[in-house]
């Protein structure tokens, strides 16, 4: 009987954990706010290596009235953290486009609004298209279980170049600039 109750308890815990995961009909107003870049992956390694054009670190996402998303990122240029502001336009449910290092189409794969968000991007630059997968969290780091979930997703999509950004300088010292604070006012 005790074993049965233990199993039932574990099932309820797992079901509760999974019920918070949103994979469709995402309420973008709930993803507005502060985020941290945790993991980054691409099928073109040089894009995410140090000084790679797609090695950017998110600070803030804001849902705009027209359903677009504005992003505040930081990147390292010549050893210094530089802010980048981008606006991604919504094309259909959960699909966005933005021009940065080529033409990009991305979707929100899944989110737990108060914990993490997983984005999958296709970039069409002049040389060759590539995939990029980004994992952001509300806190500076996440559990090993979530990191393993990200790795599994990447492997299922043929992406083997994966970086744990919690182990590098993510320009955390540059967060909270006056411009970024102004953009977070709702």
From Swiss-Prot:
UniProt-recorded Gene Ontology molecular function terms: odorant binding; small molecule binding
So which domain of life are we looking at?
Answer: Eukaryota
Q: Which keywords does the record carry?
A: Allergen, Behavior, Disulfide bond, Glycoprotein, Secreted, Signal, Transport
Signal peptide range in chain numbering: 1-15
Q: Which PROSITE patterns match?
A: LIPOCALIN (PS00213)
Q: Which cysteines are joined by disulfide bonds?
A: 81-171
Q: Which positions are glycosylated?
A: 51, 66
Q: Which InterPro entries match?
A: Calycin (IPR012674), Lipocalin (IPR002345), Lipocalin_CS (IPR022272), Lipocln_cytosolic_FA-bd_dom (IPR000566), Maj_urinary (IPR002971)
Q: Which compartments is it annotated to reside in?
A: Secreted
One GO cellular component term = extracellular space
Question: Is the keyword Transport in the record?
Answer: yes
Q: What is its main location?
A: secreted
Instruction: Give the tissue specificity.
Output: Abundant in urine (at protein level).
The function of this protein is: May be a pheromone carrier. Acts as a kairomone, detected by the prey vomeronasal organ and inducing fear reactions in mice.
The record's similarity note reads: Belongs to the calycin superfamily. Lipocalin family.
Q: What is this protein called?
A: Allergen Fel d 4
């Amino acid at each position: 009987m005790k074993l049965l109750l233990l199993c039932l308890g574990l099932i309820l815990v797992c079901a509760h954990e999974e019920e918070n995961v949103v994979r469709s009909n995402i309420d973008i107003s709930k993803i507005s706010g502060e985020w941290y870049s945790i993991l980054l992956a691409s099928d073109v390694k040089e894009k995410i290596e140090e000084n790679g054009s797609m090695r950017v670190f998110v600070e803030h996402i804001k849902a705009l009235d027209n359903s677009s998303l504005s992003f505040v990122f930081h990147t390292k240029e010549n050893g210094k953290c530089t802010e980048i502001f981008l606006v991604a336009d919504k094309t259909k449910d959960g699909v966005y486009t933005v021009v940065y290092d080529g033409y990009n189409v991305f979707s929100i794969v899944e989110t737990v609004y108060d914990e993490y968000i997983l984005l999958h991007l296709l970039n069409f630059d002049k040389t060759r298209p590539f995939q990029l997968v980004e994992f952001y969290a509300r806190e500076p780091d996440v559990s090993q279980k979530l990191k393993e979930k990200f790795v599994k997703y990447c492997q299922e999509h043929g992406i083997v170049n994966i970086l744990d950004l919690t182990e590098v300088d993510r320009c955390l010292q540059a967060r909270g600039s006056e411009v970024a604070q102004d953009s977070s006012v709702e």
